[in-house]
Amino acid sequence: VEGTAGNTGIGLSLVASFYGYKSVIVIPETQSEEKKEALKMLGAKLVEVPAKPYSDPNNYIRYSERLASELNKVSKTGAFWANQFDNVNNRKAHIENTSQEIFEQTNGKIDGFICSVGTGGTLAGVSIGLKQRTSNRKIGLADPAGSALFKHYTDGILKSEGSSITEGIGQGRITKNLEGLKPDFSYNIRDEEAL
């Protein structure tokens, strides 16, 4: 069971299908029909919920946590909640794998790394992994309008302003995967620039 804007759900559903497991994906109803169709084609049971902020108990992430707990009580085989936002194995995989691949494929000639944030696992994990090799590498955040991270890392204020058409990117809280991250640069990217 996972709450996702689609991408992680697609990956989890693909793996679940391969191993013969059932996947249940809780997704905001505002996500693209293409993602929803891909999830259904992979055999996922799709639970669409209204888009709500994380503070709302019916936010798709919180809803998926409750659903996993309920299914775990009644299912013969149990249920597992992936919890991509706060499961630090997400970040760990990027420390141990993604950052090492980047380092090896650039022959160590990398001055910096920049990406946007969904769960925070990629940015924080690659940051840690690259800085373990050489601490002077620069790390940047490319944050869409509507996300709170740009203001948090530039002004110390965790506050969302505006909106964006990007799906699954932008964060309104410091996830466990983001804890301790201190990017060297933060950029607020408007939709016009991103597209």
Q: Which residue stretches match the model-derived regions?
A:
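Gly-rich Lys/Arg/Thr-decorated short loops/hinges at beta-loop-alpha junctions or inter-strand turns
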Residues: 41-44, 75-84, 175-182
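Glycine-rich phosphate-binding loop signature in dinucleotide/nucleotide-binding domains
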Residues: 71-79, 102-109
